[in-house]
């Protein structure tokens, strides 16, 4: 066999082997991905919607709205929801479960859809009869 004929046989053999490996690869890929659409939601499946429930409205109403007094605090206090510093006469709520302070508009909006503090996630409904105050603790130096 001459050199050109041998080269043609090699090329055809290489192409045939490459085609076989490619076909095997595609079959394996199709087999491996066969059940991957099981996680998709089909219209016939029923969906269970989990709805976040907010705080009991009576508990929210029991948390008084107070006017902030900056002179009562040695450090500036910031609302962690809106990231603004409290200024004198800002209306605020102090959550009874953790004593975190927020502008009352933001607190009310949050608590209509969640029952925890937006800062520390403590349950706000746990301590309903807590006395609320924005004055500093007299025992803290």
UniProtKB/Swiss-Prot annotation:
Sorted UniProt keywords: Membrane, Metal-binding, Transferase, Transmembrane, Transmembrane helix, Ubl conjugation pathway, Zinc, Zinc-finger
Cellular localisation: Membrane
Enzyme Commission (EC) number: 2.3.2.27
Stored Pfam families: zf-RING_2
InterPro entries given in the database record: ATL10/ATL72-79-like, Znf_RING, Znf_RING/FYVE/PHD
Pathway(s) of this molecule: Protein modification; protein ubiquitination
Gene3D superfamilies noted in UniProt: Zinc/RING finger domain, C3HC4 (zinc finger)
Entry GO terms, CC: plasma membrane
UniProt-listed GO biological process terms: negative regulation of short-day photoperiodism, flowering; protein ubiquitination
PANTHER family xrefs: RING-H2 FINGER PROTEIN ATL78
This protein's domain notes: The RING-type zinc finger domain mediates binding to an E2 ubiquitin-conjugating enzyme.
Family according to the record: Belongs to the RING-type zinc finger family. ATL subfamily.
Protein name per UniProt: Putative RING-H2 finger protein ATL62
Organism per entry: Arabidopsis thaliana (Mouse-ear cress)
């Amino acid at each position: 066999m001459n050199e050109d004929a041998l080269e043609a046989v090699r090329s055809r053999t290489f192409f045939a082997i490459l085609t076989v490996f490619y076909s095997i690869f595609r079959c394996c890929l199709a087999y491996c991905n066969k059940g991957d659409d099981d996680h998709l939601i089909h219209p016939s499946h029923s969906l269970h919607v989990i709805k976040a429930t907010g705080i009991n409205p009576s508990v929210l109403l029991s948390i008084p709205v107070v006017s902030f007094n900056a002179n009562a605090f040695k450090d500036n206090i910031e609302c962690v929801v809106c990231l603004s510093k409290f200024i004198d006469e800002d209306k605020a709520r102090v959550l009874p479960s953790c004593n975190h302070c927020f502008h009352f508009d933001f607190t009310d909006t949050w608590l209509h859809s969640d029952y925890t503090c937006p800062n520390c996630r403590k349950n706000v409904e746990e301590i309903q009869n807590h006395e609320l105050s924005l004055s500093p603790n007299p025992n803290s130096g």
